[in-house]
Amino acid sequence: ALGADISELIGSEVSKAQAEAELIRSRMILEPVVNLLHLRIRLSDPNIGALDRIKSNSTDTQINKPEGVSLKTEDGEAKISQFNVSQEYLNQPFTLTRSATGFVLTNGFDDFKGQIGKGHLFKGTDGQIQITVNDLPADGYPINITKQSLQTTTEQINTDLSVVEKGKQTGIIQLSMTGANQQQTSLILKQIVLSYIDQNQSRGSEETTKTISF
């Protein structure tokens, strides 16, 4: 797990520390992080089962950065910089495959055909899909892609995130986070702290200092 300390120089009231901990876990703090790192986009390799992931520590996990989401496979890398869907398509699985002319996106009902490196707006049975595919594995190699709801994504973050007061009535809030990829977890945690700092500045809080360490 990776951790960071946020020091509160505004008294040691337990209620204050609890309030700040709740703020850190709130949508107000987490939503900017989710949007910046495209955390609502989920990629997976259907050729790798759950048992394979448990057995192998070398199984690739998706990487989320401001420029997009990527996932390495044995036949190449998937890179997605944009994936927005209508409400009806949220949390629904789609499959992406490379084709001779670009890519095919399907949910089992609708098939959408597009070009690599170009933004597309598709109109499906249940709404619109906006997607930019920058790269995909070799022809025919499938990639599962899902656009999660904001609630689902923030709940997952909070499951992995620990926010506790360090010691007894110290006024110092300690953050730690678990994840399969240490570099990815570090980036998410750092952005959560930065979002918290930004929110404090917007609240006009000049009494709070923050330190982050890994």
What residues fall within each predicted segment?
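Alpha-helical transmembrane helix bundles of large polytopic membrane transport and channel proteins
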Residues: 31-136
